[in-house]
C-alpha cells in the first residue's frame, strides 16, 4: 500500500500543511515536516482527537422527531356593522419527540414499570434551562467566595481591634499609675517643705496648692480621654459585630436558597397559557379570589401612605355597594349617595392622588414650589453675525423663537421665512432692534492658512525684478502701435476694427534690462480691464495723441494711475503728423494735474512716433530710470504669487489663464489657487506661444489645468498640496453663492413695491458668450448701461467659451437672444437654434454689438404720440335736423378739414369739448376733406350744443418712433 505524507493528506483535506501538523501534535502524533509519512494508525488517532474536540459521530445521530399538525376550522363572527361573516381559522401544533438516553432509562423502568408520559420539551428550551442552572451555580459559587473573603477580612479586623483595645487599656492604666504616683510624691514633698520651714511665705504655699490642683485636673482629664477612647473602641466593636451578623444573615440566606428546591422552568407556551388564565379569572368588576379568601386591595399594598387609605367598608353595609370585598371599588370618601364616581384608595386632591389637584392637567401647584424663577430683567447678548446667516440660526444665537425674528423683520418691512438667508448688514440691524449687541464675526476661514505662506515669503531675501509697465490712453491714440514698434511685431494690424479689445501682456528685452508691458483697451467699455492693469503695474505710460489731445478715457486712465499710486510717463504720440500740437496736449494735461518735469512736476513728457520710431529709445530710458528710482524687488526662490490678467475657455485645452507673476517662481506642476478655481499647472506658455518650464517675477505666462475659468483680476497663489487648494476653492464658492443670494433677496424685497408702482418694464433678455473673461465683463457692462426706465437689458447668462446646446436651451426657456463675441456656435448648437428659432448674433467689434442692441431696444420702446393741428373752422349757422341733431354750417378759415380728423370746440377761446367728426358734407354730398376758403356742413359725434361764433380746431395724432 502506498505511503501518504503530511503534505498529501493536507492537500486532500484542503488545509495547509502547517495547520495539519499542529493538529497532529495536539493528537499526540509526532510529525515535524510536511514530508513525514503518516500511517493508518496515525490517521485513526487524529480522527479520534477531532471527534473528541468537535463531538463524536453519535452526537450527529437523529435524537428528535418534530411532528407538525395543522387543523382548519370555520367560525362566524360579527363585524362592526353587525353583519355576520365566516372566518377561516387555521391551528398549527408542533410536537418534538426526544430520544432518551438508554443508560438512564433502564433504572427508570425498573423503579417505575408503569408507562409515564414524559413532558415534551424543545431542545432549545432544555439548553436554555441548562444555561440558566449553570449561571445560577456560578453566581452561588461567586457569592460564597465573596462571603468567605468578607468573613476573613472581618476576623482580621476583629483581631486588630482587640490588640488595639488591649494596648489602649494598658497605656491608660500606666498613665493613671504615673499620675497618681507623681501627685503623691509632690504632696509629700510639699508637706515636708511646710513642716521644715514654717516661715515660708503663705503665697508659695498657695502657688503649690494651685499647681497641685492643676496637675490633679490634668490627671483627671487624661483619665476621661482614656475612657472616651475606650468608648470609641467599644463602638467600633459593636459596628464590627453588627457587620458580622449581617454577613452571617446573608450567608444563611444564600444557604437556604441553595437548599431550596429548584424552580421549574416553563415553556413560553405554558407561561402564555397561565397569563391568559389569570387575565380571564378576574375582571375590573369581579376581582380574583384565591382559595376562599380575597386578594388584598392594591391600595393596601402601598406602605408609603397608609394614612391616606380610607377605612374598609363593612361587609353588610349596603351603601358601599360591593363593599364586602376588600379588593372591590369603594364610593367616594365623602359618601355620594347617588352613586357618583367610584374610586379606589386616596381621593384627596394632593399631588400624589390619582385625580390630581384642583386645576386640571396643567396644574403645577406645589411641584414648582422651589423651582427657579427666571429673571425679569432683559438679557443682553453679544451676537456674532457672519457674512450670511439664516433666520433660524439668528434666532438661536439670540435665544429667542424664530417667530420673534420674523415679526421684527415684518416691522422693518421685509417678509422672510425661517430658512431664508440674510446678509450681514440686515442681520445686524435686526439684532440691534431686538435689544442685543451685534458683532461682525469672522468665519472659520481656511484662507487664514494662506497668511502663513505670506509670512514665509517675507522671510525670503528679495532680489531686483523687472518693472511692469501698463500702456493706457484713449482709443485710437496709438497704444498698440507703440508696443508693436517696441516689440518689433505687428499686433495692431490684425486686430478687429483696428482697436484693442483684450488686455495683452508682453516682456521685452532691452540693452538696459527686461520690461514687461501690459496693453489695455482704450474703449470706454473696458474700464474694468484698465483698472486691473493699473492694479498690477509699477509704471503707467499714458499715450496721448498730439493731434487729438486729452479725451475721456485719458482722464479715466489718469484717475486709475493716481488711485494705484504709480508714477506716470506721458508719451505724446503721432508727432509726425502735420496737425500735431504737443504744447496744447501739455496744457490740457496740466489742467488734469499731470505736471511735466520742465514745469517743475514729476512726470516726464516724451514726444514719440509709433510710425517712424522717433523718441522710442528716450521713452524706454525714462521708464527704466523710474524703475531704478522705485527699487523694485521680489523674492525669487519662493512659492509664486501673481495676478490673473486675462482668462478664456479653449474648446480643446480647457480653461486658460494669463498670469503675471509678481513674486516667487511659478513652475510647471505647481498647484495653484485663483479665486474659486484651482488645479495643477499642466502646461505653461510664454506670450509667443512657446512652452516655458518656469516664470519668475514680472513675467507673464499662460497656464492650463485649472478646474474652471478664473475671474480676471483674481490673485494666484501656489499651495503645497491640491487638497488644501480644493478646500479653499469650495469654501470661496459657497461663500460667494450665499452672499450673492442674500443680496439678491434683499434687492428683490426692496424693489418689489417700486416695480409694482412703475408697472411692467419691457426687458430684452440676452445670453453673452465671449472669447475671454475681460471682453465678456466689458460687453455686459456696456449693455447694462443701455437700460432705461422703459426698456431694460437682462443678461440671463454670461460666460467664456463657444456657444453650446445648453446655451440654446437656456435661450429657448428665457426667450433670449444669443450674442457671440469673437466666438462661434458648434454644429449641434446651430442646428438646435435653427429648429427652435433662436437668434444668434456674432460680433468681433464691441461697437457693433452695442449699436445693434441699442437699435433693438429702441424698437421695443412704445411710440411717442404727437399732435398736429391741420385746420381751423368757424361756425356761421346752426341747423337742427330731426333724428340727426345739430348740424353746423361752417367756413374753413385755415388748413384742411378731413372726415377722419379729431376736433376741439372753442367758445371764446376756451375748449368746451373734444371729440371726432361724425359727418362732413359740401352741399348734399359727403366729402372726405374740405380745403381753406370753402364752406361745409359738419356734425360732431355726441355733441349738439354748437352755437354760432364757435371755432372748431381740427387736429390729428401721429405716432413717432422713439430712439434711445
UniProtKB/Swiss-Prot annotation:
Residues 464-633 form the tr-type G domain. Residues 573-576 are annotated as: G4. Keywords: Cytoplasm, GTP-binding, Initiation factor, Nucleotide-binding, Protein biosynthesis. InterPro entries: DNA-bd_dom_put_sf (IPR009061), EF-G-like_DII (IPR053905), IF2_assoc_dom_bac (IPR013575), IF2_II (IPR044145), IF2_N (IPR006847), P-loop_NTPase (IPR027417), Small_GTP-bd (IPR005225), T_Tr_GTP-bd_dom (IPR000795). Residues 609-611 are annotated as: G5. GTP binds at residues 473-480, 519-523, 573-576. Residues 150-185, 199-255, 268-279 have a biased composition (Basic and acidic residues). GO terms for molecular function: GTP binding; GTPase activity; translation initiation factor activity. Residues 346-359 have a biased composition (Gly residues). Residues 498-502 are annotated as: G2. SUPFAM superfamilies: Initiation factor IF2/eIF5b, domain 3 (SSF52156), P-loop containing nucleoside triphosphate hydrolases (SSF52540), Putative DNA-binding domain (SSF46955), Translation proteins (SSF50447). Gene3D superfamilies: P-loop containing nucleotide triphosphate hydrolases, Putative DNA-binding domain, N-terminal subdomain of bacterial translation initiation factor IF2, Translation factors, Translation initiation factor IF- 2, domain 3. GO terms for cellular component: cytosol. Belongs to the TRAFAC class translation factor GTPase superfamily. Classic translation factor GTPase family. IF-2 subfamily. This is Translation initiation factor IF-2. It comes from Ralstonia nicotianae (strain ATCC BAA-1114 / GMI1000) (Ralstonia solanacearum). The gene is infB.
Amino acid at each position: 500500500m502506498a505511503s501518504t505524507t503530511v503534505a498529501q493528506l493536507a492537500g486532500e483535506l484542503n488545509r495547509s500543511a502547517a495547520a495539519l501538523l499542529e493538529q497532529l501534535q495536539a493528537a499526540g502524533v509526532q510529525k515535524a515536516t510536511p514530508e513525514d509519512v503518516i500511517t493508518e494508525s496515525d490517521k485513526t488517532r487524529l480522527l479520534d482527537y477531532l471527534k473528541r474536540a468537535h463531538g463524536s459521530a453519535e452526537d450527529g445521530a437523529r435524537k428528535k422527531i418534530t411532528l407538525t399538525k395543522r387543523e382548519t376550522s370555520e367560525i362566524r363572527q360579527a363585524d362592526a356593522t353587525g353583519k355576520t361573516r365566516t372566518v377561516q381559522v387555521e391551528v398549527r401544533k408542533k410536537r418534538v419527540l426526544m430520544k432518551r438516553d438508554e443508560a438512564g432509562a433502564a433504572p427508570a423502568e425498573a423503579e417505575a414499570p408503569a408507562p409515564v408520559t414524559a413532558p415534551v420539551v424543545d431542545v432549545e428550551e432544555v439548553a436554555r434551562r441548562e444555561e440558566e442552572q449553570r449561571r445560577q451555580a456560578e453566581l452561588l459559587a461567586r457569592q460564597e467566595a465573596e462571603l468567605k473573603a468578607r468573613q476573613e477580612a472581618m476576623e482580621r479586623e476583629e483581631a486588630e481591634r482587640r490588640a488595639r483595645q488591649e494596648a489602649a487599656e494598658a497605656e491608660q492604666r500606666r498613665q493613671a499609675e504615673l499620675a497618681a504616683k507623681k501627685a503623691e510624691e509632690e504632696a509629700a514633698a510639699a508637706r515636708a517643705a511646710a513642716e521644715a520651714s514654717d516661715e515660708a511665705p503663705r503665697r508659695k504655699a498657695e502657688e503649690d496648692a494651685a499647681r497641685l490642683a492643676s496637675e490633679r485636673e490634668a490627671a483627671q482629664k487624661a483619665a476621661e480621654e482614656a475612657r472616651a477612647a475606650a468608648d470609641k473602641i467599644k463602638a467600633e466593636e459593636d459596628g464590627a459585630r453588627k457587620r458580622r451578623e449581617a454577613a452571617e444573615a446573608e450567608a444563611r440566606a444564600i444557604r437556604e436558597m441553595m437548599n431550596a428546591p429548584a424552580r421549574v422552568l416553563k415553556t413560553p407556551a405554558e407561561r402564555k397559557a397561565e397569563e391568559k388564565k389569570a387575565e380571564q379569572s378576574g375582571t375590573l368588576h369581579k376581582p380574583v379570589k384565591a382559595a376562599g379568601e380575597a386578594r388584598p386591595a392594591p391600595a393596601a399594598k402601598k406602605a408609603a401612605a397608609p394614612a391616606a387609605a380610607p377605612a374598609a367598608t363593612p361587609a353588610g353595609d349596603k351603601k358601599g355597594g360591593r363593599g364586602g370585598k376588600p379588593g372591590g371599588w369603594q364610593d367616594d370618601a365623602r359618601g355620594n349617595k347617588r352613586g357618583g364616581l367610584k374610586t379606589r384608595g386616596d381621593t384627596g386632591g394632593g399631588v400624589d392622588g390619582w385625580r390630581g389637584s384642583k386645576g386640571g392637567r396643567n396644574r403645577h401647584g406645589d411641584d414648582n414650589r422651589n423651582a427657579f424663577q427666571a429673571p425679569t430683567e432683559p438679557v443682553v447678548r453679544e451676537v456674532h453675525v457672519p457674512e450670511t446667516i439664516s433666520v433660524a440660526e439668528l434666532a438661536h444665537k439670540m435665544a429667542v423663537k424664530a417667530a420673534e425674528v420674523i415679526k421684527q423683520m415684518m416691522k422693518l418691512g421685509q417678509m422672510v421665512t425661517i430658512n431664508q438667508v440674510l446678509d450681514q448688514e440686515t442681520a445686524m440691524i435686526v439684532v440691534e432692534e431686538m435689544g442685543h449687541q451685534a458683532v461682525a464675526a469672522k468665519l472659520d476661514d481656511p484662507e487664514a492658512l494662506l497668511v502663513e505662506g505670506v509670512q514665509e515669503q517675507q522671510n525670503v531675501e528679495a532680489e531686483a525684478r523687472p518693472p511692469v509697465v501698463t500702456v493706457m490712453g484713449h482709443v485710437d491714440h496709438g497704444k498698440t502701435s507703440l508696443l508693436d514698434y517696441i516689440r518689433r511685431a505687428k499686433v495692431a494690424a490684425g486686430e478687429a476694427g483696428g482697436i484693442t479689445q483684450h488686455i495683452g501682456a508682453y516682456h521685452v528685452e532691452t540693452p538696459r534690462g527686461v520690461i514687461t508691458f501690459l496693453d489695455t483697451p482704450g474703449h470706454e467699455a473696458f474700464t474694468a480691464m484698465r483698472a486691473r492693469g493699473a492694479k498690477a503695474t509699477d509704471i503707467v505710460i499714458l499715450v496721448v495723441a498730439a493731434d487729438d489731445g486729452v479725451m475721456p478715457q485719458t482722464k479715466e486712465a489718469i484717475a486709475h494711475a493716481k488711485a494705484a499710486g504709480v508714477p506716470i510717463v506721458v508719451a505724446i504720440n503721432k508727432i509726425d503728423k502735420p496737425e500735431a500740437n504737443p504744447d496744447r496736449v501739455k496744457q490740457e494735461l496740466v489742467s488734469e494735474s499731470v505736471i511735466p518735469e520742465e514745469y517743475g512736476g514729476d512726470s516726464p513728457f516724451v514726444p514719440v512716433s509709433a510710425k517712424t520710431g522717433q523718441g522710442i529709445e528716450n521713452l524706454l530710458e525714462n521708464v527704466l530710470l523710474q524703475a531704478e528710482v522705485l527699487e523694485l524687488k521680489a523674492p525669487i526662490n519662493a512659492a509664486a504669487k501673481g495676478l490673473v490678467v486675462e482668462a478664456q475657455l479653449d474648446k480643446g485645452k480647457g480653461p486658460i489663464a494669463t498670469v503675471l507673476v509678481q513674486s516667487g517662481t511659478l513652475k510647471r506642476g505647481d498647484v495653484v489657487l485663483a479665486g474659486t478655481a484651482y488645479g495643477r499647472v499642466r502646461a505653461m506658455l510664454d506670450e509667443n506661444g512657446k512652452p516655458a518650464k518656469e516664470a519668475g517675477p514680472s513675467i507673464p505666462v499662460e497656464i492650463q489645468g485649472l478646474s474652471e475659468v478664473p475671474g480676471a483680476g483674481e490673485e494666484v497663489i501656489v499651495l503645497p498640496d491640491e487638497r488644501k487648494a480644493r478646500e479653499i476653492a469650495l469654501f470661496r464658492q459657497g461663500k460667494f453663492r450665499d452672499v450673492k443670494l442674500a443680496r439678491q433677496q434683499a434687492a428683490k424685497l426692496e424693489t418689489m413695491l417700486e416695480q409694482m408702482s412703475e408697472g411692467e418694464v419691457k426687458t430684452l433678455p440676452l445670453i453673452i458668450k465671449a472669447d475671454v473673461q475681460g471682453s465678456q465683463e466689458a460687453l455686459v457692462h456696456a449693455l447694462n448701461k443701455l437700460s432705461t426706465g422703459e426698456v431694460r437689458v437682462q443678461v440671463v447668462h454670461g460666460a467664456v467659451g463657444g456657444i453650446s446646446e445648453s446655451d440654446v436651451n437656456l435661450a429657448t426657456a428665457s426667450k433670449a437672444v444669443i450674442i457671440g463675441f469673437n466666438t462661434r456656435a458648434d454644429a449641434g448648437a446651430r442646428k438646435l437654434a435653427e429648429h427652435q428659432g433662436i437668434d444668434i448674433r456674432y460680433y468681433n467689434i464691441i461697437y457693433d454689438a452695442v449699436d445693434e442692441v441699442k437699435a433693438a431696444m429702441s424698437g421695443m420702446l412704445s411710440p411717442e404720440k404727437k399732435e398736429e393741428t391741420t385746420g381751423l373752422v368757424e361756425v356761421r349757422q346752426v341747423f337742427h335736423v330731426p333724428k340727426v341733431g345739430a348740424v353746423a354750417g361752417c367756413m374753413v378759415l385755415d388748413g384742411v378739414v378731413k372726415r377722419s380728423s379729431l376736433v376741439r370746440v372753442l367758445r371764446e377761446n376756451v375748449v368746451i369739448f373734444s371729440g371726432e367728426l361724425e359727418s362732413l358734407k359740401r352741399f348734399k354730398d359727403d366729402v372726405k376733406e374740405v380745403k381753406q376758403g370753402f364752406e361745409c356742413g359738419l356734425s360732431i359725434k355726441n355733441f349738439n350744443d354748437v352755437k354760432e361764433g364757435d371755432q372748431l380746431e381740427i387736429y390729428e395724432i401721429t405716432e413717432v418712433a422713439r430712439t434711445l
